[in-house]
Design a protein with these regions (language model features):
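Conserved non-cysteine loop/helix-boundary elements of the Radical SAM core domain that shape
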Residues: 1-15, 19-142
């Protein structure tokens, strides 16, 4: 995977040579399944051409994929923000979404990420969601801030 992305960067160099990226986002699907080594290779290629000290580099993760080792590796590779795909703190709602994580894994992931620049993705309008459960999701997310 990393080689294909780096190849695309190399082939696009003439188009992007004068550009500066203010943000880089690894998301859409499950980038957290990629190895830290692959992410580091991609970031090395990007950093050598397109980013600066203030570039925000975000990495989207499912709660089940968060581990101290993975987070430490991503931070060392240059990631400076984690986007955690919580969606809901209620197991019934997570089940309705077909998510593989549960509320316990969310809390464990948040504990690991407590000193990391983190955003949380929530969903509204989930089957079986109530106004009260969504309010609860918001409140539980605010605890992390």
């Amino acid at each position: 995977m990393a080689e294909a992305v780096i190849n695309d960067i190399d082939q696009s160099e003439d188009l992007i040579a004068e550009r500066f990226f203010s943000s880089v986002y690894f998301g859409g699907g499950t980038p957290s399944l990629a190895s830290v080594e692959s992410i580091k290779k991609i970031l090395d290629a990007v950093n050598n051409r397109l980013t600066g000290e203030e570039t925000e580099i975000t990495f989207e993760m499912n709660p089940n994929d968060v581990s101290t080792k993975k987070i430490d590796g991503l931070l060392m590779a240059g990631v400076n923000r984690i986007s955690l795909g919580v969606q809901s703190y209620h197991d019934q709602e997570l089940k309705a979404l077909g998510r593989v994580h549960d509320s316990d894994s969310i809390l464990e992931a948040k504990k690991i990420l407590q000193d990391t620049n983190t955003t949380i993705d929530l969903m509204y309008g989930i089957e079986k969601q109530t106004p009260e459960s969504f309010t609860s999701n918001l409140m539980l997310s605010l605890i992390h801030i």
